[in-house]
Amino acid sequence: LAVTKKRIQPDTSAPTKRIALGDIRRLKSVGRREYNNVIYNGCKDYEKRCKMTLDDYMNKHFPDLMLCPPLFYSWEIGIRFELGNPPMFRIDKQQYMEQVYDRAISIYKYLHKESDEIFVVTNAHFADEPNLIRRKPKVYRRYITNKEVLKGLKHKVIPYVFADVYGIDDFETHRFILKCFGRDIKYMSMIKAICNNDVAIKPKIYHDVFFVNFTTGTIFHVYDDRGCDVVSNSKTALMNLYRDYNEWILNYDRSRIDQTLGSNFTEGSHSI
């Protein structure tokens, strides 16, 4: 059987309005202006982000927080994780360090993406050493892949961050700041070197290194092979981390962390 297509007749009951060519041009012009405004404003925002310094960012998002350990006890919203199991260190040092590396790298990967903008901040503590300003710490020379990015490395001398703790006045803290993307960091080998700080394993990084994630609003710091701190200016930014790595939370501080982040957490829902 031959099938004939039925022609759909236009609805003539509703009045139609003819759009003039000039109206079309005006609509296109308005759309173009709106599009250009979006692009312009986006570029302005990006330019502001590029020009924002670490101090600008910290003053805006982490007011009164000093970038020095212990971060967890200096900020309201945070998690302290246990990396190494102390009894295991005496039994099997290699197995102990493998757990330390695995946990530290897993948490770092969870928090940082390749496209994230990150301040890599290093605190080096010395007595007066004028030649230090001419040297890039190994933190940057070894573990930053993009050598062009290294040209943006900033150096400043600030008062010794532990002066109140140790009562030492003749030391000063040399702070190095590099703004880069997550993809520029050899994070696996870098995290391992940070974890090696207090154990007889090389390579090691002696200085405090902080990963200030400009994109997500988190700060990550491994204080040694025992543990690491993650703080944020938003509870939302840490909820998934709290849920998925709940078993790694340091029990000593668990009650405080649960009180801060546990209200939206269902027991038994965590997984690693």
Which positions does each model-derived feature cover?
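Alpha-helical oligomerization segments
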Residues: 211-272
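Ala/Thr-enriched low-complexity intrinsically disordered regions
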Residues: 2-4, 12-16, 20
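Short amphipathic alpha-helix segments
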Residues: 200-209
